[in-house]
Amino acid sequence: MNTSQAEIELDLDLQLAIENSQLPSKQNFELWVRTALPKTMAEAELTIRIVDEAESQELNSTYRGKDKPTNVLSFPFEAPPEIEIPLLGDLIICAPVVELEALQQNKPLQAHWAHMVVHGCLHLLGYDHINDAEAEEMESLETQLVESLGFNNPYKEQ
C-alpha cells in the first residue's frame, strides 16, 4: 500500500449523477485514489463522476467511438509544460456497469469499485493497455495496488 497516502493533499470532487444505495463512501473513494497515486506526489486534484448507462454511453461514443456504456472513462488533464498544477483529470464511472460486471465476474462489489478507481487513476497518471507490454505492466501494478487494499487479484478468475 502507499505508505505515505495520508501525506498526499487530495482534493477529490465526487459527483453523483445517479441515485444508488450501493455506492461506496467518499472515504473509500479517497482511500482508493490515494493508494493509486505515487508516493512522491504531494498533492492531487481530480473529479470522479458516477453516472448511469445513458451518460456513459454518450461519452464513450463521443470520445472513443464506442456506442455502448463502459465501466470507467479517464480524461487526463494536460497542462502546458511551463505550468505545474496538481490537477490529474476526471474519471467517469458507470455504476450499473460496475455492478453488472461484479456480478458476472463473481467479485465483491466493493472490490470491483476499488479496481475501477485504481484502473482509472493509473490512466490519469499515463498508464495504458494498448499493447501487450503496456497491458502487462498496468495489470501488474493494478493487482499490486488492489491487493494492498485487501482485495483479491482483479484479473484472477474467481
Curated annotation (Swiss-Prot):
Disulfide bonds: none annotated. Belongs to the endoribonuclease YbeY family. Pfam families: YbeY. This is Endoribonuclease YbeY. The keyword Zinc applies. The gene is ybeY. Zn(2+) binds at residues 119, 123, 129. Its main location: cytoplasm. The lineage of its organism: Bacteria, Pseudomonadati, Pseudomonadota, Gammaproteobacteria, Alteromonadales.
